[in-house]
Amino acid sequence: MRIIFSLFAFLLIATYANANNNKERFYIMPYEQQEAIKDLTNSIMQAKTKIDIAIYSFTNREIAKALREASNKGVKINIIYDSGQKKAENSTIGYLEKFDNIHTCLLEGKTARNGKYNGIMHQKMIIIDDNLIGLGSANWSKNAFENNYETLYFTYSTDTVKKASHYFKDMLKQCKPFI
């Protein structure tokens, strides 16, 4: 009986530890650049229904190709870019906008109290299937993943995903179409 109980306890602990390890993933670049980009692109490719992205600067072709492939599988994708990225060299906005299932738009930050300037949309966030969220300091550029000191964090936290989704929807309503 003791052996059965010990085996059961071991399996329970092993299952909990494994489930907990898959709930959160944290990368520090440039040290874990390969793992971070692989996790991000794999997460995109595993999406089933929808991907919501708010990203300040997005020039990384590998990530753009993963989004194109996801859209080809029928995944609906919304990407909010900072309004200043409309004319940015190498931005993926024009490339991704032309694909079915990908909607891109531009968002400007709030107007300063003095009315003289606007803030920026400086998020670096991806929400996949209202289930997984990725957050970090890194823009989606080759330089950010390979040379900069940046972070990328993934979690399945229901509360975090729900809160981020709420604010993403609000930002999306304020977004102006990319034309």
Residue positions per predicted region:
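Sec-dependent N-terminal signal peptides
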Residues: I4-I13
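Sec/Tat signal peptide C-region and signal peptidase I cleavage site
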Residues: T15-A19
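HKD-type phospholipase D/PLD-like phosphodiesterase module
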Residues: N20-Q46, E69-I179
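Acidic, metal-coordinating catalytic cores used for nucleic-acid/nucleotide bond scission
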Residues: Y56-E62, G84-K87
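Beta-strand acidic-aromatic groove motif in beta-rich domains, primarily in extracellular
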Residues: A64-A66
